[in-house]
Design a protein with these regions (language model features):
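Beta-loop-alpha module in the N-terminal Rossmann-like domain of NAD(P)-dependent dehydrogenases
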Residues: 58, 71-84
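Conserved Rossmann-fold cofactor-binding substructure of NAD(P)-dependent oxidoreductases
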Residues: 51-65, 77
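Rossmann-fold NAD(P)-binding glycine/threonine-rich loop
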Residues: 96-121
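N-terminal Rossmann-like NAD(P) cofactor-binding module of classical short-chain dehydrogenase/reductase
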Residues: 63, 67-72, 92-93
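Helix N-cap at the beta1-alpha1 junction of Rossmann-like dinucleotide-binding domains, i.e.
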Residues: 32-35
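Active-site-lining helix/loop region of Rossmann-like oxidoreductase modules
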Residues: 6, 142-185
Length: 185
């Protein structure tokens, strides 16, 4: 499958490496190609395009011919990248929802009809759990001869002597300033 990964940070670069190992034809785009290449590693030959993820034309031009568009950018860019996927007639996968407009309904659901009309699949909010968790398991399993069973227990705590962020700076800021979700009664 021809796959284009938009956003080549920690999660995006791991996806690129795993998909390449599985035999997919992968290219990627990022606003900072040099940083993306550092995430991919010095020996990587995977093409990295400079892409403005706030511009549909920039995404479509870089991802032309992709059958799957993976959005590993901050969730605030979801709507733009979803429109690009529809224009490309590509399947779509993203990591998170940007819940500021409606904290109980992912904004990606507004695009459901467009994907159905094109007979394309959109998988939304596949980020940390199970997304990144499964990617880390797959990367670890590749280092072993055999794996019989994997059990996952998700525990939302991070402990370290130095500061650790599970999100990019943009996502952490977005989470901090988003309206809270209130449950009553």
């Amino acid at each position: 499958m021809r796959v284009f990964v938009l956003g080549v940070g920690a999660t995006g670069s791991l996806l690129v490496q795993l998909l390449t190992r599985q035999g997919h034809r992968v290219s990627c785009g990022d606003r900072d190609p040099e940083r993306a290449r550092r995430f991919l590693g010095a020996t990587s030959t995977i093409p990295v395009h400079e892409v403005n993820a706030r511009n549909i034309r920039s995404i479509v031009k870089a991802a032309c011919g992709a059958q799957l568009l993976i959005n590993a950018c901050p969730a605030i860019l979801n709507k733009i990248v979803l429109r690009a996927a529809l224009r490309l007639r590509a399947h779509y996968l993203d990591m998170a929802a940007h819940l500021t407009e409606s904290p109980f309904r992912a904004e990606q659901l507004r695009f459901e009809t467009g994907f159905q009309d094109l007979r394309r699949t959109a998988v939304i909010t596949a980020g940390v759990a199970p997304g990144l968790t499964n990617l880390l398991i797959a990367a670890s399993a590749d280092l072993l001869d055999t794996v019989e069973t994997v059990y996952v227990r998700l525990y939302e705590a991070t402990e370290s002597d130095s500061p650790v962020s599970q999100w990019s700076a943009e996502v952490a800021f977005d989470e901090a300033v988003s309206r809270p979700r209130l449950y009553r009664h």
